[in-house]
């Protein structure tokens, strides 16, 4: 049923060919026509980042509409919990999110308390652990540093590397080393200037690149 409809019963008594009719009381089935609206699409952010505020289309219905946002860290088919204070048509997730989280909005009409859940959207967190590289070395001028051993980076997406160097110390300005894009790096022999090195790891997931 999609339309509010009233009903009554007509009773007829027939005696000696004479039909007499009477109507019962009238009852009404009220249809609470609640349309949930919609909320914004999935997002991917770097760990600890700030998701964009969720845009939405407001719900419409026969009564007064109220909202409650819910979240789940076990996916759209997982268990959802109410987010305290999140009772507007839109919602802005606080910055600092470190766990992939799904969200949905529940719209409720005060007319007979009908509630409708919206589509679920997911904020995917692109986590990245940068790994580590070998310890400091001291060489003679013009010598050949030992190749830098390392622990590989791990992340949610595809991992790429870029080695950088600085002749002004670890707090100085670093520049990319051309072609140095592997997990390890071997400095060419002949180094005559004290040089600092670091490896930048990047995890790319859903077109979002996160570096450490």
Q: Positions of the model-derived regions?
A:
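Surface-exposed, short loops/turns at beta-strand junctions within beta-sandwich domains
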Residues: 1-4, 95-100, 189-194
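Extracellular recognition modules
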Residues: 6-12, 68-70, 102-108, 162-164, ...
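Solvent-exposed loop segments of extracellular immunoglobulin-like
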Residues: 59-71, 153-165
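Surface-exposed, flexible coil segments in extracellular/virion-facing regions
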Residues: 71-95, 167-188
């Amino acid at each position: 049923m999609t339309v509010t409809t009233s009903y009554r019963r007509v009773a007829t008594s027939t005696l000696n060919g004479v039909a007499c009719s009477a109507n019962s009381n009238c009852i009404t089935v009220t249809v609470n026509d609640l349309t949930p609206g919609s909320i914004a699409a999935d997002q991917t952010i770097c760990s600890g980042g700030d998701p964009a505020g969720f845009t939405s289309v407001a719900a419409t219905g026969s009564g007064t509409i109220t909202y409650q946002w819910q979240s789940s860290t076990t996916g759209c088919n997982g268990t959802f919990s109410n987010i305290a204070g999140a009772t507007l048509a839109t919602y802005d997730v606080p910055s600092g999110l470190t766990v992939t989280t799904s969200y949905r909005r529940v719209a409720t009409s005060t007319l007979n308390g009908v509630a409708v859940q919206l589509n679920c959207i997911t904020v995917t967190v692109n986590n990245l652990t940068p790994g580590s590289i070998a310890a400091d070395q001291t060489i003679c001028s013009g010598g050949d540093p030992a190749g830098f051993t390392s622990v590989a980076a791990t992340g949610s997406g595809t991992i790429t590397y870029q080695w950088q160097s600085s002749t002004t110390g670890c707090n100085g300005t670093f520049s990319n080393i051309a072609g140095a894009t592997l997990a390890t790096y071997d400095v060419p022999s002949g180094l005559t200037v004290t040089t600092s090195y670091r490896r930048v790891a990047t995890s790319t997931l859903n077109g979002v690149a996160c570096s450490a």
